[in-house]
Amino acid sequence: MSKSQISREFAAASEQQLKALCERRFDQTDILVVYIDGIPFGDCHVIVAIGVDSDGCKHVLGLREGSTENGRVATDLLNDLVERGVKPDRPRLFVIDGSKALRCGIDAVYGSRNAVQRCRNHKIRNVLGYLPEDQKDQAKCAMQAAFLLDADKGIQKLKQLAKWLEQSYPSAASSLLEGLEEMFTINRLGLPKTLRRCLGSTNVIESPNSGIRRRTRRVTRWRDHAMVVRWVAASLLDMEKRFKRIMGYEQLWMLDAKLKDLPVADAVDQEAKVA
């Protein structure tokens, strides 16, 4: 069998896998946590959503070509999840990168009665990107230590760090303070440390990301963005077969209870956010 024939057969198979993924329904699956992050492939970005049900099992929910910073793409992905059964009729925890467009999309599509946790790994990388090498370790350790504290104490510690950074590294200070409250959502919910370790970042997506790159390392040329999306879909579905339940899944009932206690957003406030 020639290489070109193998390539055509794989393209056809991966197209079917992508179609199957995009048509999945979750009406009978109680999705409690939704992780959303982007995977870059050169000039192409793919947004991936992975859900965790109330038993701690992971599910590949969907994907879209585009960046999380693209408001229309992010909202399209969220609307697609709603259409396929991840309805806005129950509060959830969304764990996302630092994208403002994605954050706004969650309120617009799912309403304000949801908890949003921003990825701490993204925040650390963003802040360190503004610092010289000799300052990175100290800042990283300070941030990681603050994340272990109660929400109010942790926020206060990072505000102190930002005040210190402001003197010489104002961009790092600004990056640190952006979205600071939502860095501590899981702390404010009073969740146990074991569960917080898994809910504080988008590692649930970043780990499959490394697996996708291993599977695609032999690809020397991406013909188009459609090829990237097909490969990502095929790789995710293959890895999903070996997904394990998240760490601390036995304590997810606590998250469920905390989410159900969240106040229902005022209708006027909700309309303003959607607008």
Put a short name on every predicted segment.
Residues K3, Q117, R221-H225:
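Alpha-helix N-cap/helix-initiation sites
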Residues S4-A12, R72-N79, E83, C104, ...:
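Solvent-exposed alpha-helical segments within well-ordered globular domains of core cellular machineries
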Residues F41, G66-N70, F94, V116-C119, ...:
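A generic short alpha-helical patch detector that favors 3-5-residue windows
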Residues A145-A275:
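Acidic/histidine-rich catalytic cores and adjacent linkers
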Residues S2-V95, K100, C104-A108, S112-R113, ...:
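RNase H-like nuclease fold core
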Residues I124-K153:
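Conserved phosphate-handling catalytic cores of large alpha/beta enzymes
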Residues G111-G129:
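Inter-helix linker motif
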